[in-house]
UniProtKB/Swiss-Prot annotation:
Its EC number is 2.7.11.1. Residues 54-405 form the Protein kinase domain. The gene is OPG054. ATP binds at I60, S61, T62, G63, G64, Y65, G66, I67, V68, K84. Keywords: ATP-binding, Host endoplasmic reticulum, Kinase, Late protein, Nucleotide-binding, Phosphoprotein, Serine/threonine-protein kinase, Transferase. It comes from Vaccinia virus (strain L-IVP) (VACV). Essential serine-protein kinase involved in the early stage of virion morphogenesis. This is Serine/threonine-protein kinase 2. Pfam families: Pox_ser-thr_kin. PROSITE patterns: PROTEIN_KINASE_DOM, PROTEIN_KINASE_ST.
Amino acid sequence: MGVANDSSPEYQWMSPHLNYFKNFNKETLLKIEENDYINSSFFQQKDKRFYPINDDFYHISTGGYGIVFKIDNYVVKFVLEAIKLYSPMEIMAELTVPKFLYNNLKGDEKKLIVCVWAMGLNYKLTFLHTLYKRVLHMLLLLIQTMDGQELSLRYSSKVFLKAFNERKDSIKFVKLLSHFYPAVINSNINVINYFNRMFHFFEHEKGTNYEYERGNIIIFPLTLYSADKVDTELAIKLGFKSLVQYIKFIFLQMALLYIKIYELPCCDNFLHADLKPDNILLFDSNEPIIIHLDKKFVFNERIKSALNDFDFSQVAGIINKKIKNNFKVEHNWYYDFHFFVHTLLKTYPEIEKDIEFSTALEEFIMCTKTDCDKYRLKVSILHPISFLEKFIMRDIFSDWINGGN
């Protein structure tokens, strides 16, 4: 079950949070709950009651190497790096690869890439872990006070997450956060949203022995959604006839992007290495996107999809040390699309309703347990890019071939 380490008698005694919460009990919390004041930015962002009332950094995601916030029209990603393994210049793929592709692609396909606006290298990022611990302790002590329990910084991961998830959508709990977050945390970085993801990152994914010392800061444009967030209702709202048509749309745009990249000189080694729906972002599209192969593909939709998160990517002479040693065999575009199709089928079981499309995707990956582990190819299957080009010429994608004519 796992119990935290912040439980030594010395730490418990000196904790300012512990001493602060000794001034409160269930009755005083009830009085706070009865007040009218509520800061709507402490609702979860998926909650319709959420509203960013301050110019704060709002936590929107944590996973892998990145802790992501949004502020105004920007997305700011803090990437904790193993600086001892790589020099700062060896961990710039997220900047250099998309910029290289954008500068070399000549047609509308370049609109399907997310380029970093700015990147700062080798910053001290210890404040993120410190902030996380402060917020965790505040939540622990607040929940204990609500339940009339003895105050302690010892906790079980399972018990804490259950208690937090049960309360996070409650208006009474949000009223308490509206009072205690400014008083105890006093920061313009709001990590209450998706706090369970940050908890998993620091407590499990990176482990207690991980060094949270240094890393990079990356600034992106703010997106409408990541592709995995679109459900049937939103797909219709975005102008698609169905969720499956939307899935075909993002698959086709990514396929066209890859085909055009592989047409570039010396770029037939391009790998993204993490092609999946949550690494595809959706932006407004104010004009048609037209991409020419043997046939013309025309997209008149009011959104476009764009590939993001090139942290593990490589292309041409830009070799990524993060993935170089992980691949035991040679791979090309098919490695990415094999993983992509698996994740599409997992994310969207609705694909099964379209027999022609689902059958085509199943035939596309055609793998066994000896070939594939957790959707990742273990063997070298180097289909030429013409394999992908033939696939997208099928009637499945007739809505966009020659403008749907």
